[in-house]
Amino acid sequence: MESAIDTHLKCPRTLSRRVPDEYQPPFAMWMARADEHLEQVVMAYFGVQYRGEAQRAAALQAMRHIVESFSLADGPQTHDLTHHTDNSGFDNLIVVGYWKDPAAHCRWLRSAPVNAWWASEDRLNDGLGYFREISAPRAEQFETLYAFQDNLPGVGAVMDRISGEIEEHGYWGSMRDRFPISQTDWMKPTSELQVIAGDPAKGGRVVVLGHGNLTLIRSGQDWADAEAEERSLYLDEILPTLQDGMDFLRDNGQPLGCYSNRFVRNIDLDGNFLDVSYNIGHWRSVEKLERWTESHPTHLRIFVTFFRVAAGLKKLRLYHEVSVSDAKSQIFGYINCHPQTGMLRDAQVSPA
């Protein structure tokens, strides 16, 4: 048994864990490890927004263009594709890329082909919406948790190895305790979301300034290789409860501190669904996320179901990654997206 916080990220605690040192978790879980040379990662969500079947072909082509741009110099180490329909009735395709070198990401983002495509007048006139939501947490600003040990998705794919069984899981507050920065920092939000360019109500190009310790969670489910019993467990028991919780946050998350919640399904380049899904949640703070997970009936049902089945999982793959980041390490840009998209809903617009 080992600590979730890797040796080179440990420091003298000024903030205590939620459990005593002799705590033993009820089942095995693991996390992704990186060597001490990893200083920061980039989690980049590139979206294409459209409405209805008439725009689907154009949206898929735009998605494929983004994927093709990943093959340019300094592209990401891994990526995946998703679809979801939001509560305003718009379809959204998201290409998610991960970099383990923020300088490489910066060079890629500023490269002539990538920059020219985003800046083109065509983006304003082709009838689609686009967004970029990018966070670059430092090594001490994110944690991961896996119920399996191979082929890690998401940020795990750019890490170096899997841990041994970890101590910090299976209790309320364990998410926070897995953050290396939690040893000395409460990870409190530093300000509010602010629109710094454009007007969400008018469409066009809009830029939102984030804030320190804005929290991003990706919580995933992969039943592609699961056999009949586990597929039934996921589709008939876990998924309905999970869907209820995710829909609740999507529709009612604002007063809870949830800026945006998207329950997405993985797809291939042609838009065909895969048996993989995950939730993308942006929150004001870790504390706001904790408060919901520990108290809301929908999440309590999810938690109870997971606890009941976790020890027996074979090919059903469940995981999550949670990060905070500094405002200077965030990018939130939107082009012709409806005003409920992503950070637009809760961002404050400065008086004219």
Swiss-Prot record:
Tell me the GO molecular function terms.
lyase activity; metal ion binding
Which Pfam families does its entry note?
Dehydratase_hem
> What cofactor does this protein call for?
heme b
Q: How is this protein's function tied to pH?
A: Optimum pH is 7.0.
Regulation of its function? Active when the heme iron is in the ferrous state.
UniProt binding sites for an aliphatic aldoxime: 219, 320
Q: Where is the signal peptide?
A: none
Does the entry annotate any disulfide bonds, and if so which pairs? none
Protein EC: 4.8.1.2
Q: Which residues bind heme b?
A: 299
Query: What top-level class of enzyme does the UniProt entry assign?
Result: lyase
Which catalytic reaction applies to this protein? an aliphatic aldoxime = a nitrile + H2O
The protein's UniProt keywords, in alphabetical order, are:
Heme, Iron, Lyase, Metal-binding
Temperature-related activity data read: Optimum temperature is 30 degrees Celsius.
Instruction: Please name the InterPro entries in this protein's record.
Output: Dimeric_a/b-barrel, OXD
The answer on whether this UniProt entry bears the keyword Heme reads yes
Q: Tell me which residues this entry annotates as catalytic.
A: 320
Entry superkingdom: Bacteria
* Keyword Lyase listed: yes
Q: What does the similarity note say? A: Belongs to the heme-containing dehydratase family.
Q: What does this protein do?
A: Catalyzes the dehydration of aldoximes to their corresponding nitrile. Is active toward various arylalkyl- and alkyl-aldoximes, but cannot use aryl-aldoximes. Involved in aldoxime metabolism via the aldoxime-nitrile pathway.
Q: How does it assemble?
A: Homodimer.
Q: What is this protein called?
A: Aliphatic aldoxime dehydratase
